[in-house]
Amino acid sequence: MIKVKKLLKIIIVAVVLGGLGYAIYDLVRPRETYEIKLWDNIYNGDSIEFFYEEENDLRIEMLRAIYNLDKIAKEDDEIKYILKIVEAAGEIVTLGDVNDTKALNGYDIIRLIGEKKTVSAKDMSIIIRDFITSAGYNARIGEIRCSKKDEDKYDRYYIVEYYSGKYNKWIAIDIVDGGYFTFENTPCSGVELVERKKSELRYIGNMSEEEYFSNKKNLFKSYTIMIDNTVDRIKSNSVITYITSKEEIALTYANESLMPTIYTENTALFTKSPEVELVAEDDKAYIILMKSEEEGVERFVVGGFKDGSIISEYYVGRNDGSFEKVNEYFEVELIKGKNMISISCDGINEDARIEIIYN
């Protein structure tokens, strides 16, 4: 009986100390600068037009000529041919822990790095996108991301998708290992990697499937693509992000500003053919944000988004609830505590609303 009492005391002390330790950690852990209190701003329409580069663009043609991309032997298996193109990029540059060049196309990236020949994952994905474009395929970059805020952990990785005439769908290619994914023996698109359970996916590449997924356990939470996938990106600087949970909505990521982002739960936006013409119209407007790069100021540039582009004229509501007419963009400087932003097309009916807590 004495031993039982001693054991109970030990268990109680352990539980108390464990709870105290977690409470202390919770107090000292850095809080998120911004907390999303409300996001009544999820886009589930179908009126976004995406833009892709033509294979006859001068910089694409330069890549093809300099690196003899048109000499890569065609394969009966389309995916094998694409993987040979990915391999060709890996013979010209190597992936390393370096900063992005900030260039928007593969030709400029390779020119900027000179003899270094080492590029970031983002730059590598741009180069591979343009190499695939040179072969006559529509291609785009995808970013898979996860923010485990409770553990202060951020993780992301890039893939490249090309549109397959054989399968009539987007097919995701891993840029590091040179592999691809399947579900029920059909190649997967980028959004499928996030939409489906990892246990349903197969990976075919140089790594074993087990090794490949071992360091990506908590990664598949959101998927982002550019609206404008051309070499100049002059038609749009916005991205669209498919989320599995509203927990994945963020204004910044790993202390970096995000590009103006439209969040959606509609996977159909990511699966449509590049040849499909835009016919739908949105029935309301949405809020799109971009953090100002000015240091020491918590300021955001805000726009109204409808029918795939920024609205030239609309109404914005702030904390007092009244609407004010604005043109294209306006700036919001956050105050400590709760910040509300809403927009309206007519100045009467609210279309979208977000509430942000600034700590």
Regions inferred by a protein language model and the residue ranges of each:
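Aromatic/pi-system hotspot detector in well-structured domains
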Residues: 88, 163, 314-315
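Low-complexity, disordered linker/stalk regions enriched in Pro/Thr/Ser/Gly
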Residues: 238-359
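Membrane-interface motif at the C-terminal end of an N-terminal transmembrane signal
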Residues: 18-35
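Secondary-structure boundary elements
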Residues: 34-120, 126
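Hydrophobic/aromatic-rich core segments of domains that either
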Residues: 126-202
